[in-house]
Design a protein with these regions (language model features):
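Secretory targeting and sorting signals
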Residues: 1-28
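Right-handed parallel beta-helix/beta-spiral solenoid domain characteristic of secreted/periplasmic
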Residues: 29-30, 42-51, 63-102, 124
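Post-signal peptide N-terminal regions of Sec-secreted extracellular proteins
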Residues: 29-32, 36-38, 294, 355-365
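Short, T/G/N/S-enriched strand-turn elements that build extracellular solenoid repeat scaffolds
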Residues: 32-36, 51-57
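Extracellular beta-strand/beta-solenoid scaffold signature
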Residues: 49-54, 76-84, 100-107, 126-138, ...
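Small-residue (G/S/T/A) turn/hinge positions that recur once per unit in extracellular repeat modules
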Residues: 59-62, 69, 88-89, 110, ...
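Acidic, glycine- and Ser/Thr-rich low-complexity intrinsically disordered tracts
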Residues: 302-303, 308-365
Length: 365
């Protein structure tokens, strides 16, 4: 059951919808859940519980400074996003906590926004929810997510990049999410399953790059103990750079089809670079490049170099026999294309690898 909205006082240059602003003798205003801010705003107290979105961003080039406070939902499905912006640019959301929504921050369309020094936690979408992530970037470009913690969000990801097409979403701008930078975050324990199901059915990723999402940078993140894969590049996602991340402890929950990998490149992706990552202690493969699926080509013309991948294959594979896109044994390094099919593997260190082309220029440890 949804609960009553709490008001919060804000200071600084703040412009609100006329129906929600209430001047006070101190010169500040009170802001209710669901309000739209159109000037830079600093919180002076917590805001919530909010039953339907926290705050809407209604102008470009403004800053929402949570000032160490939190915006929180009701911990029920369909609470929307804690901070929601559509078609905005130059917005900064910083310095606080957002929890108990369907997404912590949702960026739809627009670009050039920043999420920094935030804790996004316990944001769980449900049936018919629009989101299921700590941060969701939907058909938006050149955004920066940095120095933040994404913990126990889902059921999709800690950070999700989505390139929407017509019919994917009832509101958001369609198009490719490109030029986004996910840098220096801690993305951990995002394990929730869909529709409130058991964690044994989770397909929740740490960082999720959905199909046909190109040209993004994932760098310097600690990605740990998420439900399925640590960093997943979905089908047709190309020219992304995955570098200098620590990726460990994934895939320990799911008990059907497959467990989870440290870093996975799904089929049809090309031109991706996976380099200088530490990948260890994952249930299935450390780093795996998927081969053909039906009529679709495998992931080809990718570069996987100078990674340290060891101590993976922690759990027995669910499909130990070869056959199908996920069948067969698992390794620290694995390419499921025949003879690696124009993928360049070079200078990696590993304990187990298959086939031999994954070991070029590298060395076992």
């Amino acid at each position: 059951m949804k609960t009553i909205v709490r008001k919060v006082a804000l200071v600084g240059a703040t412009a609100l919808l006329a129906t929600v602003g209430y001047p006070t003798s101190a010169g500040a205003v009170e802001l209710t859940c669901g309000a739209t801010i159109t000037q830079s705003t600093t919180l002076t107290a917590d805001l919530g519980p909010c039953p339907d979105y926290g705050l809407h961003i209604g102008a470009n080039n403004i800053t929402l400074n949570l000032n160490g406070f939190r915006i929180f939902g009701t911990n029920e499905p369909r609470d929307g996003a804690g901070v929601w912006m559509v078609g905005r640019s130059g917005v900064t959301v910083t310095n606080g906590i957002i929890e108990f929504f369907d997404a912590g921050v949702a960026i739809e369309g627009g670009g050039g926004n920043t999420v920094s020094n935030m804790t996004l936690q316990h944001n769980i979408g449900g049936l018919r929810s629009f989101y299921g992530d700590g941060v969701a970037i939907l058909s938006s470009v050149n955004n920066l997510v940095t120095n933040s913690t994404m913990r126990n969000n889902g059921p999709f990801s800690g950070v999700g990049l989505y390139s929407l097409v017509d019919g994917d979403h009832p509101r958001a701008t369609t198009g490719t999410s490109t030029g986004n930078q996910i840098i220096g975050n801690v993305v951990t324990d995002n394990v929730a399953a869909r529709a409130g199901g058991p964690v044994t059915s989770t397909d929740n990723d740490g960082i999720r790059i959905e199909p046909e999402t190109h040209g993004n940078l994932i760098s310097g993140n600690i990605v740990r103990n998420n439900g399925l894969d640590g960093i997943a590049l979905f089908a047709g996602s190309s020219n992304n750079i995955i570098t200098n991340n620590t990726v460990e402890g994934h895939g320990m929950y799911r008990t059907s089809v497959r467990r989870g990998n440290g870093i996975i490149l799904f089929n049809r992706g090309t031109g991706n670079v996976v380099e200088n990552n530490l990948v260890r202690g994952n249930a299935d493969n450390g780093i795996v490049v998927q081969g053909p699926v039906g009529a679709n080509a495998g992931a080809t013309n990718n570069t996987i170099r100078f990674n340290l991948s060891f101590g993976n294959s922690v759990r027995p594979p669910l499909n130990p026999n070869p056959g199908g896109p996920f069948g067969g044994p698992t390794f620290d390094l694995q390419d499921r294309n025949v003879d690696c099919d124009n993928n360049v593997w070079f200078g990696n260190r590993y304990r187990t690898a298959f086939p031999a082309c994954t070991t070029t220029g590298g060395a076992p440890i």
